[in-house]
From Swiss-Prot:
It holds the Pfam family DAHP_synth_1. GO terms for biological process: keto-3-deoxy-D-manno-octulosonic acid biosynthetic process. One of its GO terms (cellular component) is cytoplasm. PANTHER family: PHOSPHO-2-DEHYDRO-3-DEOXYHEPTONATE ALDOLASE. Coiled coil: none annotated. This is 2-dehydro-3-deoxyphosphooctonate aldolase. The gene is kdsA. One of its GO terms (molecular function) is 3-deoxy-8-phosphooctulonate synthase activity. SUPFAM superfamilies: Aldolase. Pathway: Carbohydrate biosynthesis; 3-deoxy-D-manno-octulosonate biosynthesis; 3-deoxy-D-manno-octulosonate from D-ribulose 5-phosphate: step 2/3; Bacterial outer membrane biogenesis; lipopolysaccharide biosynthesis. It is found in: Cytoplasm.
Amino acid sequence: MKLCGFEVGLDKPFFLIAGPCVIESEQMALDTAGELKAITGELGIPFIYKSSFDKANRSSGKSFRGLGMEKGLEILATVKREIGVPVLTDIHEIDEIKPVAAVVDVLQTPAFLCRQTDFIRACAQSGKPVNIKKGQFLAPHDMKNVIDKARDAARDAGLPDDVFMACERGVSFGYNNLVSDMRSLAIMRETGAPVVFDATHSVQLPGGQGTSSGGQREFVPVLSRAAVATGIAGLFMETHPDPNKAMSDGPNAVPLSRMKELLAVLRDLDALTKRAGFLEDNFGWPACA
């Protein structure tokens, strides 16, 4: 699959989707995107900038949601133009798709909406690549149905059907907790779509602070190493210059100052993993046949 001018897949270096959870200001967006571009450029990692204009599923109705679609898209367009990087943002309603697709390079669907057929079909018919997040309630093999819906919709519209990604972001484990089953990354390869691992939402503690979600950012390096060692096409990671002051998802965001050292480790591990190959491709039962 070709994405934003670069090839993605298990035979290619992983690409990175990264940025603050929500757009807080134009200057912060420009500064963060510029820093990430410099880091990924030095490390040779393909990069897509991510930030949201609206967080429609906050734990509390009193929490900051964002700057709104009009202002948010203006800022994303500025980042794209001035920093020279492709941009991604998420949409939450069918009516948002057309104006957002006119600005960004990649669309992203919220995990909660992965089973909404009309929504997935509309996103697939936007003409843009779509990063489709797996719901916290969904088995990994069920993502094949979701990807198939998107492909069918694209073909119905006469559009390419190989522009969709399947993204793992953890699965609910009791109340206010998520776990990451690394088997899901291998299982989701059966969709035929590039698999992306969301390393920061996977350490989220949904609603864990009562009116907001908590998180355990100290486990981002742990899970991201595990995912890269399993084998992924892409890595999603939210970052912030000062996570403790972030207006959304600070507890699970990676400090921007730590991104370079983490990505350097992951780049080297990714190269080793892909050079060694994937034994699981022909490791099924019976093992001694």
